[in-house]
Amino acid sequence: MCRVLGSLYYRQPQDPLLVPLFTLIREGKLAANWPLEQDDMLARLQKSCDITQISTDYNALFVGEECAVPPYRSAWVDGANESDVRAFLSSRGMPLADTPADHIGTLLLAASWLEDQSAEDESEALETLFADYLLPWCNTFLGKVEAHAVTPFWRTLAPLTRDAIGAMWDELQEEEE
């Protein structure tokens, strides 16, 4: 789930690496492997899978100095900086690109990566990632995405992402008990 969502936020929609994912969405096949009951939202994504429109909206929302909704934690959390996130992820052994580590897409991909490592201490790392680096700002960020998006795709992906992050956090809390 995090890998899918992280990829959609991290990569430009026209990126060739996303073609298989957008094909799954367009053909309505993502729902078959989606662990949450979000069929209505997934159906809305399927109906609004126009790459040109999605790309235009992506650029207006997330790209450049004048973007409507900066996709970086440091833009939403007072005193936050990208280097803290980079240091945390590096300490867990995650390979990082030269792109900002506090990008929403990077953080969701990091959650997937940490989950894939599945060592005992990685669930603690996953909790730290959510508690310190995702949850303090993602609801505000996703609310702004929903408010500023002009396409049904991004207006739907924002609450779908919010619900998914909430469900993953709940699952982490249950594992801790």
Give the residues covered by each predicted segment.
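Surface/interface-facing alpha-helical segments and adjacent flexible terminal/loop regions used
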Residues: M1-E177
